[in-house]
Every structure is written in C-alpha cells, then in structure tokens.
Amino acid sequence: MAEFLNDQDTRLCDNCKKEIPVFNFTIHEIHCQRNIGVCPVCKEPFPKCDMETHMATEHCQVTCKCNKKLEKRQLKKHEETECPLRLALCQHCDLELSVLKLKDHEDYCGARTELCGTCGRNVLVKDLKTHPEVCGRDVEEKRVEAAMPPNAYDESWGPDRIWIASQLRQIEALDPPMRLPRRPLRAFESDLFQSRTTNQRSMTAQFPIQNNLLEEQERQERNRSRQTPKERGEDSANLDFMLALSLQNEGQAPTLAEQDFWRVIYEADQSREGPSALNDIRGAVDETMLPCEFCEELYPEELLIDHQTSCNPSCALPPLSVGSTSPRGVEDPDAIFQKLMRESAGGQFESLMGFSSSAPVEDSVVIPCEFCGVQLEEEVLFHHQDQCDQRPATANNHVSEGIPSQDLQPRETSPELPKRRVRHQGDLSSGYMNDLKQEMAKGPTYPLPSSRPPNNTTAPPNRLSTSTSGPRPGCQPSPPRALKLNNLDSQGVRGHSRNSHNGALAPGHVPAAYPARSLYPENLVPSFPRGPSGRYGASSRSEGGRNPRVTPTAASYRSRTAKAKTPKQQGAGDAEEEEE
C-alpha cells in the first residue's frame, strides 16, 4: 500500500499551488477554492477567514527607530543586520554603542596607551594584540642610543650646524640635474636634530625658522637608526671643517661663494687620499679664531680679512648675474661637482661629507629665491626667504628708496586762473586810480571848490563836473557824460534837476553845452538806456513822463546837448581820450 501511495501520480492545484494526488484532486480542488485564499502581497495560501488578520499583522507599514518605513514582517531582520542605530560592542573596551558612533569611538579608544608588563613601554591599545610579537626588540636600540651622549659634539658649534643644514640645501639646489641625494642630507639632519640639547631649544630669537621646523622633523627622524660612535666622531670633525669654510664666504656674492666652496671641497677631497688627511681636517678646527669687527663672529685667522671685506656694511654687494663666468684660474663649479660625483664611487665623497650610500634623486619643484637668486625646493623656499641675508629691511624698502620724497620734488603749480568777477555799474576799474593820480599831478583841469575833494559829490549843484577848457584843435568837443552815483546822491540830483526845469531861466543866460569829463572809468555803463539818436533821448522821455511840468525850454536844452556830437565824432573823442 505504501508503494502504491509513493508511485501514484500528483497534480498541481491552481489555487494553493500544491501537489495533490490525482485520485483526491477533485475533492481537494472543491474544498480549496471554497475555504483557502492566496495573499495578494506575499502570494502565500491562507484560510479566507484569517486573511484580514494576516494582512494586519504581517503586511502593515511600521517605522523603525532610524525613521525607515518597512513591513512588519521585515522589521526584525532590519534591526539585526541593517539598521544604523543598532547596538554594537567596541573591540577595545566592550562598550555598547550605535554603529554610527562606533568607528569614531574605536579610533579614540584605540589611541590610549597601556603599560606593557614585559618591556615596560607604553603601547597603544589598538596595538596590544600585535605587540607581543615585537615586545623587547626596542630595548637594544635604547642601549645603543644611551651609549652616545646627546652632547658628544662641541656645544659651541651646535647652532652653526643648523646653519650648515640650510646651506647644504642651497648647495643641493645649485645644479638641479646634479644635486646631492636626498637620503644623505636627511640622515645628516636626523643626526643634527636628534642631538640638540635643552639650551639649543631656547635659541628662538637667533634661529626662529629652524626652531619652527625642529619639532616636526624630530618626530619624523626619532625612530631612525643612528651611526656608530666612530663614524659620528669623523662626521663631527668634517662638519666643523665645513662650517669654517662656509663662514668664510658668508657675505660674498652667491656666485663667488659657490666657486670658493666647491674649490675647497675639491682640495679637501684630494687631500684625503693621503694618510694624514683626517689630521689636517681636525687641525683646521684647532686654528686661532678671531672675532669680526662688524658681526662679532669668530673666524679663522687667515680668513678674517676676506670676511671683513665682505661683511663691511659700507661695501655694497655686487649685482647678481645669471650668466657670469668663473674667474681665471678657477675651474667651473659644474666640472668640479661632476668630478666629485665620479670619484664618489670609491666612498671618498661620502666619507668627507659624512654620508652613506644613497638612493636616486627624487623629483621635486625647484624655485629661485627672489632676493639672492639661489634655487631651492618648494617646501624650503618660504623659510629661506624669511631669513635671507639679502632680504631688505622692509618689504617695500627698495621701492621707496628709488622714489624721491614728496618734499624734495619741485611742486608743479599752475597759475591760478583769474576768477571772473561780475562788475557792477558803480564799480571802479583797477587802473582808474592810477590814471586819476597822474592827471591830478599835471594840474587841476576841473573847476572844483577847494573845500571838497575831487571824488566827493555831496553838494547837489556840483554833481556834474564840467570842463572849462576849450575844445582842442582838430577835435570836436565831446558830449557831456553821465555819472553813476549812489542812491542818495542820485535822488538829490533828480530833485535838483526838477527844480531847475520848473523855474524860469535867468534873463540873459544862454544855455550852453559844456563837455564833461567823467571821474569814473570809460567802461562805465550808464544806468539809463541809450537811444540811437542821442545819449539822453530816452532819459528826456522818462523825465518827461515822471514830471509832466517840464517846460519846452528845458526839453529844447536837452535835445541840443544830445545833438552836440554825432556817433562818429563820439567814437573819435573816446579814442583820443584813451591815447592820453
């Protein structure tokens, strides 16, 4: 019977998607379609009576604590594997933190140190798992360092060795294709900065730029291996010798200093071929040192005169020349340097400079100094320019010296244009008083009373001064001219003229036209308008309009005086007066 059940055929139900035996398929299909339904979301068969409960409990939307919305049936898996706010243990301190903050906490927690019970060193917490492999190996290195005291070299040359390090970088940049290798120079700087003492750390005032770089370079060179005491002794002697040679060329032009430096290095390299080469180099250190009278620095006796010549502030440094040639009798620095590089295969140059075998030269950006023209690396250029010997006292010193001061320059002042002055009718011209004084000196030509000055017009009868002299030969008498008076005087004149016109003329008096010479300048414009026929035509009409009682005799008198001179004769009379 069991074999019959296993070997029977099955058929897939379309409703519940299950395999049903063929002999029972009809009954199952009827029951399944009546009682079982398929979930439209998960496509799983469920009883139709439980479909609503299934949708409410499994497929409803819920919000996770990370603000992500998902179905309720997926929430558990999300919280265990995907949620960023799920809790996790720190691998160093076993503290539970959210996954978002776990990485920052592990970086901070792993940076703590703990004392190793075996070697007695402080080890980082993150390195505790790998520390047993290297525990005890650093003790031997410490013993080697303790064998060489930090002040093994001469204390008096300590600050100057810092200067030599900067000079070596300048020498390294003289010829970029043939520069010294980087590794020997870094090894020298490592030896220099690791051997600094507490007194040298307080030299901020004398060497500010070097002291700023010491801390970082010390950290980089702290774990590097050191040389043996024997090599260190020779290195110190060679560096002292190089210091004396470098101080010789301190104040000279860069081209001459470089030539002398390379020449002496070449001679020293040749001298090392003999058995007494090291003794000669050490003998140079024991020479008599004398202070310079300008900078008060110590220099060898035979080099003091050359240094004082260049150190004298009254002597100007020669200008820099890019294409300058070497002096006669001195080899080209490039040829000397190439020769040194060829001979360095035997270890002579390395032993002289205190360098070991080096790697190939690395590529770097080389930029010339804007003050001395020496080519330096990009990371060293800024610090070199800050302490360059040829840098002026101020940034704009060389610019301000070439420009003369404002007080010494001739002040260019353009003549001020005369202001245009509005001249009124009653104003006097500038040359009128001078002309009047000259005419007064010649003699009085006007019958004015002695009790009144010529310019005073206080009495109404004498407002108009007339000329008693006759007409000149060849010239016609000029017509009378009106005077511009002030307001009070003009009112008095008008009143006097009205009274004279109203009254009858004295018997036997014949009115005559006397040519009047004006006391005011010729460019004076009368206050009353001029008519084309005569000067007093408009005035007579205006007077007649103001005073209707003017007699015909007065009107005829005015007309005769107005017609006494034609316009042409008037122009001729004015020109004659201007010539006087």
Curated annotation (Swiss-Prot):
Chain positions found as N-acetylalanine: 2
Modification sites for Phosphoserine: 190, 326, 414, 429, 469
Entry-linked InterPro entries: Innate_Immune_Apopt_Reg, TRAFD1-XIAF1_Znf, Znf_RING/FYVE/PHD
Domain of life: Eukaryota
Gene Ontology terms, MF aspect: zinc ion binding
Annotated segments matching region Disordered: 197-236, 392-580
GO cellular component: a single term: mitochondrion
GO process annotations (BP): negative regulation of innate immune response
Composition-biased stretches (Polar residues): 197-209
Function: Negative feedback regulator that controls excessive innate immune responses. Regulates both Toll-like receptor 4 (TLR4) and DDX58/RIG1-like helicases (RLH) pathways. May inhibit the LTR pathway by direct interaction with TRAF6 and attenuation of NF-kappa-B activation. May negatively regulate the RLH pathway downstream from MAVS and upstream of NF-kappa-B and IRF3.
Name of this chain's protein: TRAF-type zinc finger domain-containing protein 1
Phylogenetic lineage: Eukaryota, Metazoa, Chordata, Craniata, Vertebrata
